[in-house]
Amino acid sequence: MIEPLLCGIVLGLVPITLLGLFVAAWNQYRRGSAIPDWE
């Protein structure tokens, strides 16, 4: 049985981690695809 505290930490960290990875990937994609188009 998973402890409530551990479950709460996981449920709290997972969305933040996914959001951080998504933002980082989006920034890299936008920087890698948009700048050559402007040049």
Curated annotation (Swiss-Prot):
Keywords: Electron transport, Membrane, Photosynthesis, Thylakoid, Transmembrane, Transmembrane helix, Transport
Subcellular location: Cellular thylakoid membrane
Membrane-spanning parts: 5-25
GO biological process: one example: cytochrome complex assembly
Cited SUPFAM superfamilies: PetG subunit of the cytochrome b6f complex (SSF103446)
One GO CC term, this protein: plasma membrane-derived thylakoid membrane
Record family assignment: Belongs to the PetG family.
HAMAP family linked: Cytb6_f_PetG
Protein's job: Component of the cytochrome b6-f complex, which mediates electron transfer between photosystem II (PSII) and photosystem I (PSI), cyclic electron flow around PSI, and state transitions. PetG is required for either the stability or assembly of the cytochrome b6-f complex.
Protein name: Cytochrome b6-f complex subunit 5
Record organism: Prochlorococcus marinus (strain SARG / CCMP1375 / SS120)
Lineage: Bacteria, Bacillati, Cyanobacteriota, Cyanophyceae, Synechococcales
